[in-house]
């Protein structure tokens, strides 16, 4: 069966790679760079190396430090308006998934008429976006490698995505030095998010030989390095491996979609303000427990990676696959991530609406290895409300 594989145009990877930022702006024929980040990063000055690199290279820049944790349609429009007023010819996303998603969505509106909700769905954007550089400061979302921007749907609740080949970055800069100061909590939940991206793509219906290779390597890197990065944020080797893993996973799931973990995790109540990576983390164990019987060969591999042990010579495929839920729970325990939706502000009366929204997320469920009804999703939520 024929398949098509897309990815970003250019990757600059390595410790200290941020110093190449001005050259990359010039390579895109730009001279005025609009930097999008969030208030928290700007407050502690994580973006300073980027600003210094641009200034040293003669690039005029403006900092927009208003990216929201859960980007809304209004916030995307505001970012776009500010970039237009500055006269930006290149937009740079600097931060975690929210800042990068804000940047990608704004890059669309800088070349296409808004509002952004016109483009919720797949390949509805008519014109190429403004040249875009993405620089992640976490190792998890993989947003820098994908063609999707996930936004809060303030009209209908939950989150929705704009998916378009025009949303691939022109250049991605991967510099793990930018992650050295991440708190352990953020390291944990973004790292698990990277693993979930790779796993859902690897086990999903749309997997290809190329995405399998990318996702398998990503999972191995996360499995071997996430605990070390969590325990010691200055571990350069572990940090670089996690940054690389996140990018590989992004290249993987960006070509296949995710599955039921994302279908559920992205439809939890917006007012709970649950970080994306955290939602993916605590939704993962019960979701893989539901899924594994549909693709035991691959879930056996996932379980072995989580355990750090190839058990193919001493356990059956089904026994290894059946261990995947417990193996995931053990990882979360090591990273001090609690399971149970009630721990994160979700109320029991929220569950039916969550199930409705998750079941409506066909873009995600269509790639899930096991078909899931609305009632099955609700049963999973209820069973794991206090788990």
UniProtKB/Swiss-Prot annotation:
Segments crossing the lipid bilayer: none
Other remarks on this protein: In contrast to some members of the family, a metal cofactor is not required for catalytic activity.
Family under the similarity heading: Belongs to the iron-containing alcohol dehydrogenase family.
UniProt entry keywords in alphabetical sequence: NAD, Oxidoreductase
Signal peptide range: none
Originating organism: Bilophila wadsworthia (strain 3_1_6)
InterPro entries per the UniProt record, alphabetical: ADH_Fe/GldA, ADH_Fe_C, ADH_Fe_CS, Alcohol_dehydrogenase_Fe
A GO BP annotation: alkanesulfonate catabolic process
Annotated protein name in UniProt: Sulfoacetaldehyde reductase
Enzyme Commission number(s): 1.1.1.433
Entry-linked CDD domains: Fe-ADH
Coiled coil: none
One Pfam match: Fe-ADH
Top-level EC class as recorded in UniProt: oxidoreductase
GO MF terms, alphabetically ordered: alcohol dehydrogenase (NAD+) activity; metal ion binding
Main function: Involved in an anaerobic respiration pathway that converts the sulfonate taurine (2-aminoethanesulfonate) to ammonia, acetate and sulfide. Catalyzes the NADH-dependent reduction of sulfoacetaldehyde to 2-hydroxyethane-1-sulfonate (isethionate). Does not accept acetaldehyde as a substrate.
SUPFAM superfamilies membership: Dehydroquinate synthase-like
Catalytic activity line of the entry: 2-hydroxyethane-1-sulfonate + NAD(+) = sulfoacetaldehyde + NADH + H(+)
